[in-house]
């Protein structure tokens, strides 16, 4: 029942934004979604399964949003460094607004948030080196970078650093920059942004995003 599943996740999200996850009751989530409690259990198996599914959904939405932020900035005429700064702005804003995303990025889970599912065994991770898991902040940081670079690909309709003519309307730097250099520069920039998630400072996001821009710009100019 995909529709019921979506409605239940939305109801669970609304519930955890209103009170700690430890105080959220399954019967209340089912009632808010307009389904029976049995339907909820059929979909998720229990509160732990519902919470893990909600965490996965919000983290995936966050990662998708990172790519969209880069795509929109690029299509607006921003160069690669400014596009990374746009991704950093999305990261800071979302981590501040969504406690579950903040917990996934920092690894600091508590009673106010549901817990992610357990990560797969190391042998499975070895076959999926660039897949994200909410319980693994290090892997999440890698995938965050991948999604940002993929946002440039979508904006230009051409793999960054790939062959072929320069895309119309896209910055020339996107084609000329080798993917490996861009990947490393973006990872450095986004890890700076993540440091502000772990240890935030007062004031607007323009200052940390400006530092991201400066670092990425310097790395790409080497």
At which residue positions do the language-model features occur?
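An amphipathic alpha-helix signature
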Residues: 9, 85, 89, 141-153, ...
């Amino acid at each position: 029942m995909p529709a019921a599943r979506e409605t239940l996740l939305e109801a669970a999200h609304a519930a955890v934004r209103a009170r700690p996850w430890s105080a959220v009751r399954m019967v209340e989530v089912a009632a808010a979604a307009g389904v029976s409690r049995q339907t909820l259990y059929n979909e998720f198996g229990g509160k732990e399964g519902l919470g893990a599914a909600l965490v996965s959904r919000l983290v995936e939405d966050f990662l998708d949003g990172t790519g969209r932020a880069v795509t929109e900035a690029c299509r607006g005429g921003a160069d690669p460094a400014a596009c990374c700064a746009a991704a950093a702005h999305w990261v800071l804003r979302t981590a501040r607004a969504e406690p579950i995303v903040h917990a996934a990025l920092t690894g600091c889970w508590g009673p106010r948030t549901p817990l992610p599912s357990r990560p797969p065994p190391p042998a499975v991770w070895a076959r999926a080196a660039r897949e994200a898991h909410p319980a693994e902040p290090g892997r999440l940081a890698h995938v965050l970078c991948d999604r940002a670079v993929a946002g440039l690909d979508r904006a230009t309709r051409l793999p960054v650093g790939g062959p072929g003519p320069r895309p119309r309307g896209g910055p020339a730097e996107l084609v000329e920059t080798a993917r490996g250099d861009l990947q490393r520069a973006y990872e450095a920039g986004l890890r700076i942004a993540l440091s502000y998630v772990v240890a935030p400072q007062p004031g607007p996001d323009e200052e940390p995003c400006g530092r991201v821009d400066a670092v990425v710009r310097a790395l790409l100019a080497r």
